[in-house]
Amino acid sequence: MGVTMRDLGKRLGVSAVTISKALSGKSGVSEEMRQRIIRLADELGYVNPNTAQNKDKGMDIGILVPERFFSNDTFYAMFYKQLLQVMAENGHFGLLELINGEMQKSLTLPNLLRSRRVDALILLGQLTEDYARLIAEQGLPTVALDFHCPVIPMDAVVSDSVLGAAEMTRHLIDAGHRDIGFLGNVKATSSIMERYLGFASEMLRNDLPIRPECVLPDRTDDNIVTLPALPKKLPTAFVCNCDVVARPFIEHLRAAGVRVPEDVSIVSYDDFNNAPGSLPLTTYRVDTEAMCRIAVQRVTERSRGDEQPPCRIVVGGQSVLRDSVSPV
């Protein structure tokens, strides 16, 4: 494994960010420290992947995806394909690596970083806070896509989960629903937490109570998808945190003798996986293409020396009204 910025930082007692600034000629590092870093880098044979002569050329961008989110028929597989297309249009090359649970627990760096094969990183999908911090400490231009870690200084591009879930909840209220539940483990990802907040804010705005027994988990805290036990008294509607869990939940309700949408209405989020023959879902469509373009643009700007404070870019979507809601 080659020498990393983190290795240099450990030797000198500074952060990988300081190493990155020193080697790229950025401000924020004393001249004495800059020279110490340069000397140590030369001594250890460190090779900087973001040298000036590469700034106007296409980059090799690593795409790190938690393994549990990725398969050929998932939302993130579609996201990944769109990322590759945007990268190709901009002269960049994308390299995928799946991050399994053991790597996150043991804080094992991805092979793409250990082999120094990439110039920048896009993190697609929620990583643990400790693992995201480890990645950020490596000093490469990095953007989180479809999640964010508030305590880690890192650019993030996310959909407008709060607004989208609020719009879906409002549609149910406008249809006469007053007893509304939520499907999603709010501790599992930042997106689910924000969608719950959007749902809860709209319920509060309309002076409607939320029954705790009707806030159902769709997965474990480790993101293993599960089907929840149903409450004895069902609400008349559910806001589901995403389409991928909404569909099996509908089948779960039907298996219990519940008609959808006649007995229980369903709204969801993402506008993904509307298979022919299945119930057309009322959902909030995420503009994944815009999110990919912004993420690639942001990581490119960072690689070219943008030193603005980390930002969180929120991308809007639109409500798509279909057949999964019945009026009360």
Regions from the language model: what does each represent?
Residues 58-170, 228-233, 237:
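Alpha-helical recognition/docking segments in bacterial nutrient-uptake
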Residues 178-179, 210-213, 260-266:
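Short acidic capping loops at alpha-helix termini that bridge into adjacent secondary structure
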Residues 226-328:
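Flexible loop/turn connectors
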Residues 168-207, 311-326:
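An alpha-beta-alpha
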Residues 1-57:
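N-terminal helix-turn-helix DNA-binding module of bacterial transcription factors
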Residues 157-182, 220-227, 246, 286-304:
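Hydrophobic alpha-helical segments within soluble ligand-binding/sensing domains
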Residues 87-99, 196, 200-221:
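Short beta-strand elements in bilobed, periplasmic/extracellular small-molecule ligand-binding domains
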